[in-house]
Amino acid sequence: MLLNNALLLLLLALAVAAGWTLGRNGLRMDLAGRAQLPSQYYRGFNFLLDGEEEDAVDAFTEALAVNEETLDTHIALGSVLRKRGEVDRAIRIHQNLLKRPQLTAVQLHQSHLELARDFIAAGLYDRAEQLLVDLATESSEFTATAQQHLLDVYEAQRDWSAAVAIAEALIASAESEGQSAAGQGQPASQLRGHYLCEQAEAAVASGDQAAARALYEQALRDRPRDLRALMGLVRCALEAGDATLAMEYFHRVMDSERRCTPEMLDLLRAICAAQEDPSLYMTSLERYYNQQHSPLLALALAEELSQRNGREIADEFLRATLNQHPSASVAASLALNALRSEDSQPECHVLDQLIRDDHGYQCDHCGFTGKARHWRCPGCRHWDSIHYLGGALEQVNGR
């Protein structure tokens, strides 16, 4: 609806601009010597009054000459069409601009950039890449913008090495100007770290653990607390059979994240199992729970206490936890244990599944929610914007 309104407003502006330009530049005269507007202008108004916006667009763009004064109107129209999904028509408008030699170099470069955006929207990444590479080379004014759009292209193509190179170019350029480098509205160093981690994960998939470790370490140079790289190094150390090194990295993981998440708990279990120390998992849970009082850690610790010392000891711990750090999920776990003592199997099963499955993640940027962590939001495509919420029970409880 907003885009439709924007198009209508733009069409009105286009009509006014066309009339003004025609009036300023002189009208054609009929046989009687009277001023005459071109037929496309009248056709455009008729289409607009009939609600036929698409035909009105074509008529007004034919009537409105392309020059320095009308360029912004043409570009704005193409942008609205692109956002409406009418990419082919946006491409035609912007290609038409590039055929106009009377435009200045800056205006041609601006048209160049808009056409590249059209190609990206259409999924024509090879054509967009060539335009953007040329633009970054030819125009210092548009270099950074072109490079930022190249990141869009390389991300879509999963060409992570090319993306790393562009991110590094943005960082170097910003440093030379004493500024902070940004790409797609995020720090270029942050993007570079994720691109390196993507390369590392590809190396893991191909069985090259050494290359993966090197790439994860490279990602940590600029961002020593990068959670993704640290978790990757934990997995690499486990794969190499070095549980001690894995635990060292895991300590850094816990220091970098404000609350324990399910995948972090899985890593801890794997590390402790690899070290073959029966008490290590329990002591680690106690250590981390004392640091952050996470309900997830409390439940894991209670489960371990139940297996080692019996359910009564576990319930005592949960009751103490509930008094000191109120939590709906801890209360639900206590209720589950009470149901078990009454042998209420159906209710036990339902509540047990609720507690085990009760966790979620949310994007800070667009609000996307899911059950698993994504390093890049599937909704808004921002990197590193999804964080652990805890469970629905914790959200109801306001924690």
Where are these regions (language model features)?
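Flexible helix-coil transition and linker loops at the boundaries of alpha-helical arrays
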Residues: M29, L98-Q107, E138-E141, S173-S189
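Structural register within alpha-helical repeat arrays
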Residues: R43, L77, L115, L150, ...
